[in-house]
Curated annotation (Swiss-Prot):
Its cofactor is [3Fe-4S] cluster; [4Fe-4S] cluster. InterPro entries: 4Fe4S_Fe-S-bd, 4Fe4S_Fe_S_CS, Fe-S_Ferredoxin. [4Fe-4S] cluster binds at C21, C41, C44, C47. Residues 2-31, 32-61 form the 4Fe-4S ferredoxin-type domain. The keyword Repeat applies. This is Ferredoxin-3. [3Fe-4S] cluster binds at C11, C17, C51. Binds 1 [3Fe-4S] cluster. Keywords: 3Fe-4S, 4Fe-4S, Electron transport, Iron, Iron-sulfur, Metal-binding, Repeat, Transport. Signal peptide: none annotated. Ferredoxins are iron-sulfur proteins that transfer electrons in a wide variety of metabolic reactions. It comes from Desulfocurvibacter africanus (Desulfovibrio africanus). One of its GO terms (molecular function) is 4 iron, 4 sulfur cluster binding.
């Protein structure tokens, strides 16, 4: 599995991670990304690549 860390101070809620994730891990809540389906994460790191704020980290656990 994978552990997703979201730096809410950096996150601007642009939703890029929501759009790019192939397994719908993220949704926006109160203008911030939340990893609601972390168990589905494939570890592809597409979200990390598209996040202009560098707010996401994905680590294998």
């Amino acid at each position: 599995g994978y552990k997703i860390t979201i730096d809410t101070d950096k996150c601007t809620g642009d939703g890029e991670c929501v759009d790019v994730c192939p397994v719908e891990v993220y949704e926006l809540q109160d203008g911030k990304a939340v990893a609601v389906n972390e168990d589905e994460c494939l570890g592809c790191e597409s979200c990390v690549e598209v996040c202009e704020q560098d707010a996401l980290t994905v680590e294998e656990n």
